[in-house]
Amino acid sequence: MAPITVKRFGRRGILAAAGAVSSGAITGFPTVWAQNIKNVTLRQFGTGVSNLNAVAEKVKQDLGFTLTMTALDTDAVTQKAVTQPKSYDIADIEYFAIKKVFPTGVMQPMDAKKIKNADKIVPIFTKGKLSPDSAMAQGTTPYSVGFVDGPAGKTFAHGQTGWMTLIPTIYNADTLGIRPDLVGRPIGNWKDLVDPAFKGKASILNIPSIGIMDAAMVMESIGTLKYADKGNMTKPEIDKTIAFLIEAKKAGQFRAFWKTFDESVNLMASGEVIIQSMWSPAVAAVRSKGIPCKYQPLAEGYRAWAGGLGIAKHLSGLELDAAYEYINWYLSGWVGAYLNRQGYYSAVLETAKQFMSPDEWGFWIEGKPAASDILSPEGKVMEKAGAVRDGGSFTERMGKVACWNSVMNEDRYMIQKWNEFIAA
């Protein structure tokens, strides 16, 4: 079992444990390299969503070296990446955070030619949208911060190059979670979050850069405000959004403001909250308790997020080779299937499919009714036979992204105003 240091501070939570699918080790290394790599330890840190014990254990089994992991919340990840660049080798970081981190020079651009499945990465990351017909979403799109011009680049390129800031690994489309047995009526819009009918039974997440995006989706849904770019608000737009939230708070609309996966699960499972900002695996966690919970598709579309693996600037030699091998292994299918089974999406769907049953693939990716019970990576029943994934297929869900999690130009001002809302 690989040594692992996991400090839990929330951020999309973990459904840890190894899946039943086996994976062949990547081979073809020189013998000396294969022997030496056993002595390598790579230190990875990032958000809890993909800092998984099962991945560290599988790395040891398949690649032979040791991967240690530390899980932090989003803000702590960004701070550590910039202020403690020698304390990690691999950063598992979200794309909207890389907008802050990469220009500081603490990470090195990655050579796309060394990534075996680079040409199979979902076009959201390599072309900016899912299909040629898809609309460009607002916010910090992964494509806009995904490339730099060269091996020493710090400035984001306007388009695809051979040098990547992160290798994408995980992403999803977020919406509202509801208790269909308690809301008492159909839910179809973001504005339903602030319907007075749910006074004292609603919740919004207290991560400023994400919570304010949910608030913006609500305000546009109501028709109160039309943003030029929800992901890059002006000061007047921030002021109006926060004033709206404070008014709703003072009216008693919100039961709580959650920061962690477990908090969101407990609020919904207890019935204290019946409509809230939520993450897909948290909905699944509520359902696993036998409690009705739905990840509700909404007319205005989804708010999306994505993360990837980046390499620290100081990494070189055998450790750098090991990092590239790890990233190639990550995209080779086993991890992708594991993440897909949690309700996320993998960056290379083609390889993940090889590690999923036709029924799993049909349910999670194609939006088909489950032919048999759908199991989580640890073997628990997540959905009963006949169930259909909320929101449908991969194309239906990721094709309806309205905005991406973002870092605004007025980020500091936004956080200051958000804190005023929480304190109000």
Task: List PLM regions with ranges.
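Extracytoplasmic/periplasmic substrate-binding proteins
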Residues: 253-316, 353-356, 360
